[in-house]
Amino acid sequence: MLQQVNGHNPGSDGQAREYLREDLQEFLGGEVLLYKLDDLTRVNPVTLETVLRCLQARYMADTFYTNAGCTLVALNPFKPVPQLYSPELMREYHAAPQPQKLKPHVFTVGEQTYRNVKSLIEPVNQSIVVSGESGAGKTWTSRCLMKFYAVVATSPASWESHKIAERIEQRILNSNPVMEAFGNACTLRNNNSSRFGKFIQLQLNRAQQMTGAAVQTYLLEKTRVACQASSERNFHIFYQICKGASEDERLQWHLPEGAAFSWLPNPERSLEEDCFEVTREAMLHLGIDTPTQNNIFKVLAGLLHLGNIQFAASEDEAQPCQPMDDAKYSVRTAASLLGLPEDVLLEMVQIRTIRAGRQQQVFRKPCARAECDTRRDCLAKLIYARLFDWLVSVINSSICADTDSWTTFIGLLDVYGFESFPDNSLEQLCINYANEKLQQHFVAHYLRAQQEEYAVEGLEWSFINYQDNQPCLDLIEGSPISICSLINEECRLNRPSSAAQLQTRIETALAGSPCLGHNKLSREPSFIVVHYAGPVRYHTAGLVEKNKDPIPPELTRLLQQSQDPLLMGLFPTNPKEKTQEEPPGQSRAPVLTVVSKFKASLEQLLQVLHSTTPHYIRCIKPNSQGQAQTFLQEEVLSQLEACGLVETIHISAAGFPIRVSHRNFVERYKLLRRLHPCTSSGPDSPYPAKGLPEWCPHSEEATLEPLIQDILHTLPVLTQAAAITGDSAEAMPAPMHCGRTKVFMTDSMLELLECGRARVLEQCARCIQGGWRRHRHREQERQWRAVMLIQAAIRSWLTRKHIQRLHAAATVIKRAWQKWRIRMACLAAKELDGVEEKHFSQAPCSLSTSPLQTRLLEAIIRLWPLGLVLANTAMGVGSFQRKLVVWACLQLPRGSPSSYTVQTAQDQAGVTSIRALPQGSIKFHCRKSPLRYADICPEPSPYSITGFNQILLERHRLIHVTSSAFTGLG
């Protein structure tokens, strides 16, 4: 019996640890401030008793997380504490400059792993190993970590990227309720026990934003579908569909209210996990539509009806066992829900097919009642296992990112906790074997490897003893003889053997192992393995059959004939698929047993863990009843002893968890030499201050040692800067030791170096920014000058093109004007032909004229319209020349020029006639002139030529014509 700290339920064996209760009472009376210790390394002295007292004090004060060096101890509160996991608290830990200085929390571990990924310190990939007994809170811890990363690792800038990140986050979080519904069950110790192991990779891109995730599962306990221990339940999903289905769905799935199913024990228990709507909504977010969901639930209902098929023993061995009368309805319903023919389903369960002889003759043998039950259970386990694997693949396809879109990952390992039940079989052996491997990983990585490395590197270190579980692992998986090898050998030999014979073989072959125990008082064949968490008795009955996990090929062929769309996808027909029966005389492939497959997958997992930086969270269960505010010291003490927590605290308090090689240390922190330049420029320095020397492979150690010393000389400067900023913890850093090949330091020293590096990088960034701004300014000026030059050239080119177009247009206009002027001259000549002949015939010929003068005069006469124009022009030829042209155009008789005088007053009045003015009244007979604009009196400005004058007059040519005419007359 267990002794309870608060005085309730005292046990008969409590005297063995009576001193613990006395120490506890003394603690409760005097050491009331012990609960304020956030790190167990500060407990003095570090013993199991003092650690236990500190944990209990913090548990009673509702403080459930405590640091133990590199490990976080998490106590299960067994009550909801919503304020402890709010998004605001997540952001507070994420935004804190030093989250390790806040209260211990699972978010501290999450933020530390996230910052390690951002720092790119090798190994960059991180892993968090959550371990503990069943019911200690491992699944809840993993769920909180996933929510934390979903909040802090998805902060893109653009709205579109934010929506994508939000969708990825929602899908990752929705994978939890689906996998818990199909993979978790209620056990004796835990209402939500994981019946499978899972390793979740949260994938991060180069900007450390979560782009996806991948889930890998290990060893689903599929036997729970058909076999549940006393006071335990089946998987949650079966209870969800029975309690949460609607009336129409109940009719469709043949699940009437209050129906009893053999594979659904304890249905009256109401658990928080029996929420059907949460599962359906999560499946919908993962891309599983409603018709597919209904198909899945229909198949699960078919499995429940399949479990109600009970057979009656046959009196004749040659006749198959017939189902009982009340099971015939279940046969019809199961066949209908699974899409199988009723008679074929019953026949495959009742009759076994045997192939024998060289010709592979087929024999049909009726099965006994026990074998019929086994084949029925095998059919159900096969369907459920395939369905679970299909769900995992759907989840991965929904949340997994492309390979080229992520570079690093953070792994979350959540496996079944250590189990010890009254009846333990192969499932418990594999589960405890996995816990032994994880414990060995912790021991090898932290307890043993660190101390051995201290000795190799030449550090002064006193070796601390610890509990090594290597003998237990040698017993389970050792070579050449171990428990697993003996069980696999029985499967390969395929010979009939009883449970007692297997027990004898194990006890005889492994008698020398200190971890193998005997229980001679037990009536059932069994053996005892002393695990790190305590001894466990395993029954050998059914051990070999479970390890074989035989699947009759006729059952697979039966499911390939199903008309159900889901089962058709789970069991596709492959004509190239090889049958399990091989012709005699040919070598058979080695039998792949359950233990072999589980061991191979576990080795792959450990390889991934070894390639990452591990972080450990130890979940502790305060009591086995799941009651809040109840702290059972015996149970907690056994868990502390099993996980080696005290040894971990000792090593963490005196050790150096940070180890960096000399080369990596110099590469990362060589910038700190800028804070103390005299170390690299003094007379004793081997290198000038111009920079680091080139490394030579032959003298690397001699090259790195002075550089490391230069970096260490900057520590006083960093300490002084930390003191100025008011950080007393960093002002007094823990010591640092330089080994032969590595530098060892504590977390506080690493934080101090990182702060100094950040300062130097900030200075370098400012220098680079200033240089970049100058360079950018010069580039902008150069580009501006180039732009101005290009613009000037373009403008010049455009101007030339414009002038060329104007010249071309002027040429076209000039030619058109010349053509038009010629037409007008011809038109005027035709109009005055008659007048010209008349004047020339009546004129006296007393004046002798030369031919040249006659031609010039004729030319002037033909231009008489110009006389009309010039008489009223404001600019042009002189007044005398103008009158001369007018006289020539009027064709007056050749005589004395003085006898014919042109009236200037009339000229000034704007009236010009080609005849002498009459002395009396006269009548004007006007007709429309063929000349355009002849009826408009021009009124030009003194300095412009407009209208008809602009078209007809060309100043230089008129002057030339009148000058020529005057010369001819002279």
Curated annotation (Swiss-Prot):
Localization, UniProt: Mitochondrion outer membrane; Cytoplasm, Cytoskeleton
Primary location: mitochondrion
UniProt-annotated stretches for the region MyMOMA region: 824-970
Gene: MYO19
Record protein name field: Unconventional myosin-XIX
Record organism: Homo sapiens
Function description: Actin-based motor molecule with ATPase activity that localizes to the mitochondrion outer membrane. Motor protein that moves towards the plus-end of actin filaments. Required for mitochondrial inheritance during mitosis. May be involved in mitochondrial transport or positioning.
Domain of life: Eukaryota
Tissue and organ expression note: Widely expressed in multiple tissues and cell lines.
Family, as annotated: Belongs to the TRAFAC class myosin-kinesin ATPase superfamily. Myosin family.
Positions annotated to bind ATP: 132-139
Classification via SUPFAM superfamilies: P-loop containing nucleoside triphosphate hydrolases
Entry remark concerning the domains of this protein: The MyMOMA (MYO19-specific mitochondrial outer membrane-association) region mediates association with the mitochondrion outer membrane via electrostatic interaction.
Gene3D superfamilies (UniProt xref): 1.10.10.820, 1.20.5.190, 1.20.5.4820, 1.20.58.530, Kinesin motor domain, Myosin VI head, motor domain, U50 subdomain
CDD domains: MYSc_Myo19
InterPro entries to which the protein is assigned, alphabetical: Kinesin_motor_dom_sf, Myosin_head_motor_dom-like, MYSc_Myo19, P-loop_NTPase
